[in-house]
Every structure is written in structure tokens, then in C-alpha cells.
């Protein structure tokens, strides 16, 4: 991690953000603190030109409106064309049909290198992409959990199927909370979405999950007991 942060400070990349006005100041300050340089631009007439000058693109659905959608599409496609890193934060994606439709459209038209959301937001994306498994009861962590360091794109989404984690506005629904008991199922679902979209998926909460589809980091603010392996 130290090496990556030093690299960012050395390169000082310009990052294009089409984000929500609630957190725009925080996003800019975090980028500056990391050694990057932020620019906030959501005018459709200039986003392709702005993106071309940058080294990365951050799209955030927090304060979504009709004006931002074509701007996000154009910026995303330009970033893909130039090989820039593109990140999606699907804030409150389950709160309305408008947000779901926009997210589905973006996932079809833009290839994302990373998607970060709370558990309800990620479950909604999984539902849109047809990778959300129906709950078949508690799954033993010891039977399926593959938690290790990460070692190791096309029409991504199909029809809406599975369970839709709508959340509470922009917050995760309490019923969706990642716990020790359901951890293995959430890891499995996150990996499936990651493989489907060929992107890194990060789920944030009391227990964070970060997966590349093959392996998964589990970062916890609470104690998770060491899984026991069944006897051979």
C-alpha cells in the first residue's frame, strides 16, 4: 500500500469526478491528501475533453439527474477508449427505478475497473446483472470461504433476476448486513458479480469485502472467529 501511495504522489494524476454535491468537497480533499489532483466537471459539452486530460474517472450516482446521465456515458466511453481507470460508486441505486435504469445502462456501455458500494447497493447491481443468488439458508463459513490476498469486458447485464437489495435511501438495509453467519454467501455473490463484470468489487460496511472474482479480502471492524476446517 505504501508503494502505491508513493506512486500516486510521484505521478500526481488528474482525476475527473462526476460526483454528487453532498460529498464533492470531501472527494476533492481526499484526492489532494493522496497526492492526486481533482477536477469536478459534469457539463456534457466538455466531459470528453476533460476526461482526455485526466488519468482516471470517478462516477457517483448520489445526486443523479437527467443532465448527468449523458455526461457520465460520454466520459466513461472516452475513459475506456483512452485506457483510463474508471470507478463507479452506485449511491442509492436501489432507491428508485430511475437509478436502477441508469446503473444498468452505464454497466452496459462503460467498462469499470472497480465498483464500490454498500451491501444493498451491490446486491441491487447483482440483481440487475442476474448474479444474485437466492438465499438458501445460512452457509457454513468453513465450507466455502476463500479469503486471501488478491493475486491474480461486452454486454454485461441480463434481465433483472434474483433478490434486489434496495436499501434505505443511500444507506444499506439492516436486513442486508454482512455478518459472520452470512459472510460466505456474500463473498460468493460478490465474486460472481466481479467475474460477470470483470471488475474489482468493494463492499463497505462494518465488514468490508474486496474481491477480484478469484480471491477476496475481508476487512473487519468487528472480531470474526477463525473458520474451522472439517475433518478429512
What are these regions (language model features)?
Residues 1-88:
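Conserved N-terminal subdomain of the carbohydrate kinase-like
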Residues 62, 91-93, 120, 206:
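Active-site beta-loop-alpha junctions enriched in small/polar residues
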Residues 98-216:
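Conserved phosphate/ATP/ADP-binding segment of small-molecule kinases
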Residues 19, 23, 211, 228:
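Ser/Thr-centric signal marking residues that sit
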Residues 71, 76-108, 112-114:
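Glycine/small-residue-rich loop that forms an oxyanion/phosphate-binding "nest" at active or ligand-binding sites
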Residues 219:
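Hydrophobic residues at beta-strand termini and immediately following loops
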Residues 222-232:
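Single conserved hydrophobic/aromatic residue that forms the stacking wall/gate
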Residues 46-47, 94, 209:
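Positions that flank functional sites
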